[in-house]
Amino acid sequence: MQLITNFSSSSSELQFLVDKVKRESLSSSSSNTQNLFLSTSPYDTAWLALIPHPHHHHHHGRPMFEKCLQWILHNQTPQGFWAAAGDNISDTDDDVTLDCLLSTLACLVALKRWQLAPDMIHKGLEFVNRNTERLVMKQKPSDVPRWFTIMFPAMLELAGASSLRVDFSENLNRILVELSQNRDDILTREEVDEKKQYSPLLLFLEALPAQSYDNDVLKQIIDKNLSNDGSLLQSPSATARAYMITGNTRCLSYLHSLTNSCSNGGVPSFYPVDDDLHDLVMVNQLTRSGLTEHLIPEIDHLLLKVQKNYKYKKASPKSLYSIAAELYRDSLAFWLLRVNNHWVSPSIFCWFLDDDEIRDHIETNYEEFAAVLLNVYRATDLMFSGEVQLVEARSFATKNLEKILATGNIHKTNADISSSLHKMIEHELRVPWTARMDHVENRIWIEEIASSALWFGKSSYLRLSCFHKMSLQQLAVKNYTLRQLVYRDELAEVERWSKERGLCDMGFCREKTGYCYYAFAASTCLPWSSDVRLVLTKAAVVITVADDFFDVEGSMVDLEKLTDAVRRWDAEGLGSHSKTIFEALDDLVNEVRLKCFQQNGQDIKNNLQQLWYETFHSWLMEAKWGKGLTSKPSVDVYLGNAMTSIAAHTMVLTASCLLGPGFPVHQLWSQRRHQDITSLLMVLTRLLNDIQSYLKEEDEGKINYVWMYMIENNQASIDDSVRHVQTIINVKKQEFIQRVLSDQHCNLPKSFKQLHFSCLKVFNMFFNSSNIFDTDTDLLLDIHEAFVSPPQVPKFKPHIKPPHQLPATLQPPHQPQQIMVNKKKVEMVYKSYHHPFKVFTLQKKQSSGHGTMNPRASILAGPNIKLCFS
């Protein structure tokens, strides 16, 4: 009764969370979807907060984007720094990154600009003084990421010119001077609009010293590189600086569009986001978190919309800067569309293979492309036969991902690849997609911080803020723990059945009830009924015990009697072990027969009995071969029998009878010998088993495909034979995946195909790099995490909201004025821009024919601004 009460309560809470996610993240009526998407960048938010309002000249004026300043006031962490909204904030500085230093300095400058929150400024400076040396000196100046080398000296200069005092040690000062020199070398070596770097200098416009560039030339470069939306490389901070320099109304329109989309005041580091990318990332998060079954209509709607958009999308020239976002989106689209049975061509993301410049760009900046390459690799998991493009894409992605893993200390990379992403790359390369348990993969995705990372942006990975909203995280965890409750109950039930049937106490056989149930329950997150999982497990237990009886316990007389009893379906004349096996089988078949009749009104007694007889007969043939009672078979004869004796189809076809009312049971049974998908499953599971058990079976005198191929091919070594079998597996696996994910060659119910795929994953997991099935403890930790231990997710602490309010002089008027975007109004911004800090003071540049500097470009002006250390 208590279990039922707990389950009912958990189910109600789960449905509440599902409805909440639908409203907040998936409803077509939800506004400002961009605000749900990328995490807030304090750095970019601060740069928008620095722009003054054109209509307020009293005292120090007021910011144009007050919501950005309010966000800064309300989002300092207890430790004194600013971090992306949704980041895991610990009680110490241990998790602080280089990016936090930049964000904190930018926010402090914004507060100082508007003469607000001196206590917050003091706390922020303490953080900077306390952590800069530790973070910067983790590596040599030459190993510091390029983006930090460009941005940090500029932010220190801006902070110093804003009278923000930082106290650094002499040792750190020397390092920072060297860092500044490295920055100067970069600025000298690279053109401002050079496109070869992963992030061109123009992306760091706000950090470029004004005295280093002719203002008129810089304005021309900015105008030339503005996107149609008015942004400079879709960077809010760079666009804010571009607006300060040029007064371009397109930039201003972009900034207003940005802030209008971000209701909480904090802006992301990348905007706008492609609508298809937004939808794809949402579906990916829901799918990999194991939430598909609760949101099928919503997911189908989004994928159909994406597929339609791709159908009419025209090829367009691609800039090197946009490659990361486009390749991330297109490879994700391919994976999600194909895995959900939509037709899609590899060409939608393999375009990068045909452009030598793009390939070279990715290989040169492979560390920054880590998350993108991981997406490409995942997409190639879904390779069909003959898809040469995917073979090449997989080779390219594998080579570069292996280089990332080979770097060892990830803190020395040019991109700040997190240890979490590093672990995910390692996992993807080590474990084949077809050997992963969906339920376990869901847990990994829920727990790993990098699961919300998209591609590397300006100074950090763009991250999905929506995933860190409490409702979605709660839904993923609640769904997982509710599944665990169901799984524990079902495992207890199947263990009771196994014990009652006497299968646990045979004495000679492997007791694998827990392993079998774990494999079939965890292999998929599809909403199969409890009956399907239980029947699969019971069938697997019967097969394991019977197979061991034929291999090690029964005499030839016993084996022939048992096989004949199954043919007659009559236990008369059977001994103790034989009778126990038959009665357990009879109980299972009767259970399936009754439930199938209740669902579909069809009696499948004869079908089931014939299916199981064929399996027992194949075991009898193997026993005769092993004991030398008949001549050794050829490879083809062996494989024909071994495909049946592995009994994968026996489990799948038995359980398929319970896939639901209306399932075409008789049609499938009548055609089962002609189903390619079933035949492929049979040969794959047999070869997966043989390639991991040939040494053991040689010792036991059993026939195995690996040994038989070597014997029939005199010149082949054992390694040659293993490679031959692995090649067959790879080819057949592509054919099998094509049957599962495409209706073109396999017009069967989706649930039937997915049941086959689940069975393949079970065998691939058991026989991936070793024979795990025969171990006693290798899966115990996995089983505990799958059924008992709840996911360990970071607990996100809300930032402490200080009591600061904008002073009256900075408060918005009662009747907000509409800012007219025209040249006259824009000029007012600069006529009233009396900034109190030296760094904003107009400096004359010694002209060499280029004229004087524009006052609007003076935010980082000053002919010889040095690092302002005390």
Swiss-Prot record:
Mg(2+) 2 binds at residues 547, 551. Its EC number is 4.2.3.25. The keyword Manganese applies. Mg(2+) 3 binds at residues 689, 693, 697. InterPro entries: Isoprenoid_synthase_dom_sf, Terpene_synth_N, Terpene_synth_N_sf, Terpene_synthase-like, Terpene_synthase_metal-bd, Terpenoid_cyclase/PrenylTrfase. SUPFAM superfamilies: Terpenoid cyclases/Protein prenyltransferases, Terpenoid synthases. GO terms for molecular function: magnesium ion binding; S-linalool synthase activity; terpene synthase activity. Mg(2+) 1 binds at residues 547, 551. It holds the Pfam family Terpene_synth. GO terms for biological process: diterpenoid biosynthetic process. The keyword Metal-binding applies. Binds 3 Mg(2+) or Mn(2+) ions per subunit. Gene3D superfamilies: 1.50.10.160, Farnesyl Diphosphate Synthase, Terpene synthase, N-terminal domain. Keywords: Lyase, Magnesium, Manganese, Metal-binding. The Asp-Asp-Xaa-Xaa-Asp/Glu (DDXXD/E) motif is important for the catalytic activity, presumably through binding to Mg(2+). Belongs to the terpene synthase family. This is S-linalool synthase.
